[in-house]
Every structure is written in structure tokens, then in C-alpha cells.
UniProtKB/Swiss-Prot annotation:
Protein name according to UniProt: Leucyl/phenylalanyl-tRNA--protein transferase
Matching Gene3D superfamilies: Leucyl/phenylalanyl-tRNA-protein transferase, C-terminal domain (3.40.630.70), Leucyl/phenylalanyl-tRNA-protein transferase, N-terminal domain (3.30.70.3550)
Keywords: Acyltransferase, Cytoplasm, Transferase
Function: Functions in the N-end rule pathway of protein degradation where it conjugates Leu, Phe and, less efficiently, Met from aminoacyl-tRNAs to the N-termini of proteins containing an N-terminal arginine or lysine.
Length: 226
């Protein structure tokens, strides 16, 4: 039975209560307050829902992740990185990045990043949890991504690209920076061909929970401001 969250508590059900079909649906309801979102990521779940649906919280099994040491850089991407074809900044314009991620895609109907979601993650950014990566081409924003950093873990949320390999360029740059900062895992949530091409793979929900247990509260060397 699906658990409905109450507004007067931030508690989530145990991850093992998540449904098998649809894979990982853990709870519904609640709100998108900053405190609830922080608790959700610490617990191992994330919000994902379409317009007209209640807020839905997910913890899929298996979980798609990328270990920084396993980043795969294709020949074409490596060439762009070596030439520093694009310029990358961090936390320069979070609002522009999440707005671009929310824009309709040619291959999808609508967007799950509603205005309410944008406001919620902007609050997380203002509190120092959510961060953006901007990819520029001669001063024009052509790609980027955003997510949350907690301890030695980064929780990726969404990315966009307006130029060839721009989002991959930003992601690869971020991964190398996270590696230098002592991060051990990047949560990619759901599998996609795009992520797998970069080296992402699946681990079990218990494995993912173990990383949360051991790395959420450890310090990192992150310095986000560019």
C-alpha cells in the first residue's frame, strides 16, 4: 500500500517499502519544502512527478550511479576537453540552469521540473545544498546541470544541452572536480543511454543505502564558487 506523507512530519517510510511496480515508488504527498527535500535525499529518495499528479517520491532498485573513477570519456569528448572548447563555471547562474533544464524537449511531452520544483531547488541552492554547473561558449550558456551535494555524495538531478556535447562536457568537468574534492559517488537515479555512455552503472538499493550511511556526513573539500 502506498504511504501518503503528512505535512506535519518529515518522516519517510523505510526504503524496502518501495513498490516493485512502478519500480521504486515509495510515497506520495507531503510538500516540497527545503527541509523535506533534504530529508528525502538523506533517506535515499527523490521527488519525480508530472503536472496534475501528487508529489511522488521514488527509490528505484537498482539505482543508477557513477563512481568518479569510472567516468568514460569518448574520443570526441576527450578532444573537446583537451582543447577547452567550452568554459565551465560552478554556481554562476543556478536559476538559468534549472530553467533551461525545465524547458520542453523535442522528444518528451511536457516537463517534470515545474515552477514549484524550480522554486524549491532554488531554496536549496540558497541554503548551500543545490549546485549548478554552467557550460559557456563565448559567453553564451549552451549547457549545464544541477544537483545536490551532501557529504561525499552528489545527487544529480537534470542536465541540458544547446550545443554538441555541451552537457557531457559539463558533466565530465564536474566529475573530475568532485573526484579532486573527495566525493565517492554520483547518484544518477534512473538509467539512460546518455548516462551509461559516460560510465554510469546500476547498484542495488541496499548498496546505495550503505553509501548514504557511510558518506553522507563525512566532510568533502568542495569549493563551489567559480
Amino acid at each position: 500500500m502506498l504511504t501518503w506523507l503528512q505535512r506535519n512530519t518529515l518522516d519517510f517510510p523505510p526504503l524496502e517499502k518501495a513498490m516493485r511496480e512502478p519500480n521504486g515508488l515509495l510515497a506520495a504527498g507531503g510538500d516540497l519544502s527545503a527541509d523535506r527535500l533534504i530529508q528525502a535525499y538523506r533517506h535515499g529518495c527523490f521527488p519525480w512527478f508530472s503536472e496534475g499528479q501528487p508529489i511522488l517520491w521514488w527509490s528505484p532498485d537498482p539505482r543508477t550511479v557513477l563512481f568518479p573513477d569510472e567516468l568514460h570519456v569518448s574520443r570526441s569528448l576527450g578532444k573537446l576537453l583537451r582543447k577547452q572548447h567550452y568554459q565551465v563555471t560552478f554556481d554562476r547562474d543556478f536559476a538559468a540552469v534549472i530553467s533551461a533544464c525545465a524547458a520542453p524537449r523535442a522528444y518528451a511531452d511536457g516537463t517534470w521540473i515545474s515552477e514549484a520544483m524550480q522554486r524549491a531547488y532554488l531554496q536549496l541552492h540558497q541554503r548551500g545544498y543545490a549546485h549548478s554547473v554552467e557550460v559557456w561558449d563565448q559567453g553564451v550558456l549552451v549547457g549545464g546541470l544541477y544537483g545536490l551535494a551532501m557529504g561525499q555524495l552528489f545527487f544529480g538531478e537534470s542536465m541540458f544541452s544547446r550545443a554538441d556535447n555541451a552537457s557531457k562536457f559539463g558533466f565530465a568537468t564536474l566529475v573530475e572536480r568532485l573526484k579532486a574534492w573527495g566525493f565517492v559517488l554520483i547518484d544518477c537515479q534512473m538509467p539512460t543511454e546518455h548516462l551509461h555512455s559516460l560510465g554510469a552503472r546500476s547498484i542495488s538499493r541496499p548498496e546505495f543505502a550503505n553509501y548514504l550511511k557511510h558518506h553522507l556526513d563525512l566532510p568533502s573539500r568542495a569549493i563551489w564558487v567559480s
